[in-house]
């Protein structure tokens, strides 16, 4: 019987194909002697193995390996057949004496292990001549060393990496996912498609150019971390935000639908003072933005034809969605009734917003929701919007209150008497 050896599938790529020990072919008489000894004791000691090796003409280390492999085969067979393994039979026999390895021999073995963790038969025989140890003991020493220190030694098994397994210079791999980019009249905030990429696969200016095309009004302090590393999106998804995007030719998001103007407010009724308030909430379509004062990027209203302008900080309402008040937020202004045309002149006399509201620099880095809440909760805004919240004229309110105070409600008896008369 041939000496069983580890299959090529269980060995690393560096260990396969090297010089290995010659396959040992067992004769029928040798196999019968080994099996007879195995039936008596599956765990023979060193003395029994040496006598058996001398009787069949085989080195004792090969006899020991045969017994190890035969025990493994029998154990697997018993497990498949759900039979208990008998284990040791009889008193335990003496074991091999521990091989003493000196410091100089250990240094030679360690030096060879650092060069190659899986030495072939020729390298082991050369080490046996240099150290004076048996080749079989050197083989066992390398097996034990690999088991105790799996990460040490040279020529380690190569690990198959993905497209983005490593970065240039031994650093961390570049992110294979691209970031959010607002597109259309009102950015949808949908993530771009997942494109696994190797370092250096994209051009150097791809990230910066795409980020500038997605949101050209980013300030230098905000656009700096957008090169090569994606940043988390703000809490509110309607804020202009740029991050690494796919190169030219990649999949792009569809344009957002164009919404009709508000039904209760025509273009002439809108207040130019209020609509002209600057704010960081409005996101225009990708295109050149008008630069604001002092060289800072400020988003401008979209100039494309057919795209209605809703004013800074305003967006189209989804059809069928009901308004839900938030904490600290005033209700939206209702359309003025026909008989309240006299109050339109009063609205024209509202003073322009203060200088603090016209400065976009302190607010440009804040989310849209916080700016809107702060604006709606200000006393000046509430005082100006109070006339719009009244749905009836003051005279009509006074008349209805007087009529209600003069007419007393009917009692239950009067109500029944009235029903009987009818």
Swiss-Prot record:
Subcellular localization(s) per the UniProt record: Nucleus
Biased composition (Basic and acidic residues): 265-274
GO biological process, one term: regulation of transcription by RNA polymerase II
Compositionally biased region (Low complexity): 278-302, 319-329
Keyword DNA-binding included in the entry's annotation: yes
Composition-biased stretches (Polar residues): 1-10
A GO cellular component annotation in the UniProt record: chromatin
Stretches for region Disordered: 1-24, 72-102, 148-167, 218-361, 386-412
InterPro entries according to UniProt: HD (IPR001356), Homeobox_regulator (IPR051306), Homeodomain-like_sf (IPR009057), HTH_motif (IPR000047)
Keyword terms, alphabetized: DNA-binding, Homeobox, Nucleus, Repeat, Transcription, Transcription regulation
GO molecular function: DNA-binding transcription factor activity, RNA polymerase II-specific; RNA polymerase II transcription regulatory region sequence-specific DNA binding
DNA-binding region as annotated in the record: 19-78, 94-153
Pfam families to which the protein is assigned, alphabetical: Homeodomain
PANTHER family assigned to the protein according to its UniProt record, in alphabetical order: DOUBLE HOMEOBOX PROTEIN 1-RELATED, MIX-TYPE HOMEOBOX GENE 1-RELATED
Job of this protein: May be involved in transcriptional regulation.
Name the UniProt record assigns to this protein: Double homeobox protein 4-like protein 4
Originating species: Homo sapiens
